[in-house]
A protein has these predicted regions:
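Low-complexity, intrinsically disordered transcriptional activation domains enriched in glutamine
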Residues: 17-21, 35-38, 69-70
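Cationic, low-complexity basic patches in intrinsically disordered or flexible, solvent-exposed regions
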Residues: 13, 36-38, 77
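Ala/Thr-enriched low-complexity intrinsically disordered regions
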Residues: 17-26, 44-48, 74, 79-82, ...
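A generic structural signal for tightly packed, nonpolar segments enriched in small/aliphatic residues
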Residues: 321-632
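Short amphipathic alpha-helical segment within the helicase RecA-like ATPase core
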Residues: 86-90, 94-391
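Intrinsically disordered, low-complexity terminal segments enriched in Ser/Thr
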Residues: 9-23, 30-31
């Protein structure tokens, strides 16, 4: 496509071009010229100009804009220097270019929580519900149908007998579901109440390593029970209040929230009409506090799923920075710091900087994002719990290029950081609402980079230095996740001096060989902490299973002639997942270890995505449950 000389000149000096066909933006302004999106880069370093995205209806309007204004003021400084020299950013400001699209605009919320735990409530009676779904174990459902007086008023006797017969026939070891056509029903206000009733029965028998709530069964039957796109209400029943978290977790992850599919019309009004209404969820038998906590977990799982599903055109390092700062703003009272390439190198975080240096040449700089939440009544000087997440926005493998079709889907390589951001927001929100008690500060570190291939990419045989001051000889640029985590765990242990350090990552394919697609593989330096993590996995539905922790067996895998260690193993048949965790642990501060610091590594490469490739939000429930238990 030919462009005017003016466009070429201006683009060369001031603009960053990115192909993009969508013109909607959460910020309402988009640059689109001949289907080409232009990002204006304003101001010198430290100036009051940052990127802004502007919409032009034609080439002529673009030309007039260029003549009229060579730089675009985009508000306040995106960052300020703190007394320690770190780059600090708040939730309203940005350290890089704005995106033409924000992934949250493509999110359709799936769950909306109702304060009533009854099948029918005054609020619900005002709405049109085509389907009413009940999910639970047989005994819990029988109790609900017997004691909920609103059912007798709204469901006829014939339908109730069909429901009872189905519950009696349900198998103990397997989930099952059915849909009963009831026809149009009207309440006293002549509003349609329900036309179908769906029953989802959860298994009552599970193995000892599984979640006793039967949440895995809910995922199997969720689509058939309540996923038909109709306006619907879902009532979840349980005899154990502790089960609601895992059941809501499972229900949420069954319905992806992100989509960029066209609606078949450019009319926003028609688009709006085609969006399905969210499911209204009621938790029968749950306290108000439990319902609030379940809602927070559901929203956090949706956030993590959306981030994983968003393409790297939007969810690049800057997109992840934007998501983190937006979460901080939603919670309120959260302090934030963001290091980009220059600050990372200045402060000795050589591993994150190295992994992201190729993408940096194209403007996609790596980042270390720090969010700090101090609960009410807790001193900021108290030792925190630290969460460290791997956030590789896209992984090509670098010069150790992924081949044989293994690269598609690598947008999900930031699943650990996404889940930790969701968990951080849920914990902070629950602490503020009083549904979870936090007795110490909570720190989140998102180690973000794009592992790109290019002339600026790190090479095998390069030697880099981590924040711990240890040198690493690269023998596999596709083993980059452990590199970014190395800087994160070192900072969390050495600088933050956390009591407990948890890192989470889609780290190794070997994890799936070891523990499969439903369990994460965990490595821990403390027996009690490991057992607690397994317990919390069962409570939350985010199952976790221990892998060996044995430095004396695994450290030799990283021997190097020229550096403190290599970054990948010599013997790929020697417990690769444990070895990868060992590499991360080698960068945890030695003095912190000697003083009894507790470390947990969660490799969730398998459970982070469904077989379809969509994100599951795995890790949110596990972390919320684990941090809550640590504060009891």
């Amino acid at each position: 496509m030919r462009r005017s000389r003016l466009e070429k000149s201006y683009k060369k000096r001031h603009l960053h071009a990115r192909a993009h066909t969508h013109t909607r933006s959460a910020r309402g302004v988009v640059v689109v010229v001949q289907e080409q999106q232009y990002m204006l880069r304003g101001g010198a370093a430290g100036g009051a100009f940052s990127s802004v995205v502007v919409s032009f209806s034609s080439r002529s309007s673009f030309s007039r804009f260029v003549h009229h204004r060579r730089r675009v003021r985009a508000g306040k400084h995106f960052a300020t220097k703190t007394s320690s020299g770190l780059m600090s950013a708040n939730a309203n400001n940005h350290g890089g270019r704005y995106h033409a699209t924000s992934s949250d605009q493509f999110q359709t919320p799936t769950l909306k929580f109702d304060n009533s735990s009854k099948a029918f409530s005054d609020d619900v009676g005002q709405q049109l519900f085509d389907r009413l779904s009940f999910i639970g174990k047989p005994k819990a459902l029988e109790t609900l149908f017997r004691e909920d007086e609103t059912l007798a008023k709204n469901v006829d006797e014939k339908t109730m007998k069909l429901i009872e017969a189905f519950l009696e026939s349900a198998k103990k070891e397997k989930a099952s579901s059915t849909v009963i056509q009831t026809g149009t029903r009207e309440n006293e206000k002549k509003k349609t109440v329900v036309q179908e009733i769906a029953i989802g029965v959860l298994p009552t028998q599970v193995s000892r390593h599984n979640d006793a709530s039967g949440a895995h069964g809910l995922q199997e039957i969720a689509k058939g029970t309540c996923g038909d796109g109709k306006t619907r209400r879902v009532v979840i029943a349980s005899e154990n209040e502790s089960d609601f978290g895992s059941l809501v977790n499972a229900l949420t992850r069954a319905f992806p929230v992100f989509s960029m599919k066209s609606k078949g019309s450019s009319s926003s009004e028609k688009e709006e009409e085609t969006k399905p209404e969210p499911m209204v969820v009621a938790l029968s038998g749950a306290s108000e506090a439990t319902s609030k906590k379940a809602k927070a977990i559901s929203e956090a799982v949706e956030l993590a799923c959306r981030m994983v599903d968003t393409p790297p055109t939007s969810m690049d390092p800057q997109g992840m920075v934007d998501e983190a700062l937006a979460a901080a703003k939603r919670v309120g009272g959260v302090k934030s710091q963001v290091w980009r390439d220059k600050e990372l190198r200045r402060d000795g975080m050589g591993c994150i900087a190295a992994v992201g240096q190729s993408a940096s040449t194209d403007g996609r700089e790596p980042a270390l994002i720090r969010l700090t939440f101090v609960p009410k009544g807790v001193k900021a000087s108290e030792r925190p719990i630290a969460l460290v997440g791997k956030g590789i926005s896209f992984d090509t493998g670098g010069l150790s290029l992924k081949v044989g079709g293994s690269m598609p889907g690598m947008k999900a390589d930031m699943g650990g950081a996404a889940a930790m951001l969701g968990a951080f927001e849920a914990l902070a929100k629950c602490s503020t609402e009083g549904t979870i008690t936090l007795k110490q500060p909570l720190e989140l570190l998102m180690c973000v980079a794009e592992n790109a291939i290019g002339s600026g990419a790190i090479r095998n045989d390069d030697v880099i230095t981590s924040y711990a001051g240890k040198t690493v000889e690269l023998n596999n640029t596709d083993a980059e996740g452990r590199l970014v985590l190395a800087d994160g765990v070192s900072y969390a242990s050495k600088t933050l001096n956390a009591t407990h350090l948890i890192d989470m990552a889609t780290l190794t394919g070997a994890q799936m060989v070891a523990t499969g697609s439903k369990f994460s593989g965990i490595v821990c330096n403390d027996d009690d902490f490991e057992l607690l993590a397994v317990k919390c996995g069962k409570v939350s539905g985010d199952l976790a299973h221990p892998l060996p922790f044995a430095p004396e067996f695994f450290n030799s895998e990283f021997d190097s002639k020229v550096a403190d260690m290599k970054n990948s193993v010599k013997n790929r048949a020697n417990a690769q997942s444990s070895c990868a965790a060992q590499f991360v642990y080698n960068h945890v501060d030695d003095e912190w270890k000697e003083k009894g610091g507790k470390w947990l590594h969660v490799d969730m490469a398998g459970p982070s995505t469904h077989d379809s490739g969509r994100g599951t939000g795995y890790g949110v429930g596990l972390l919320v449950s684990l941090v809550e238990e640590l504060n009891k």
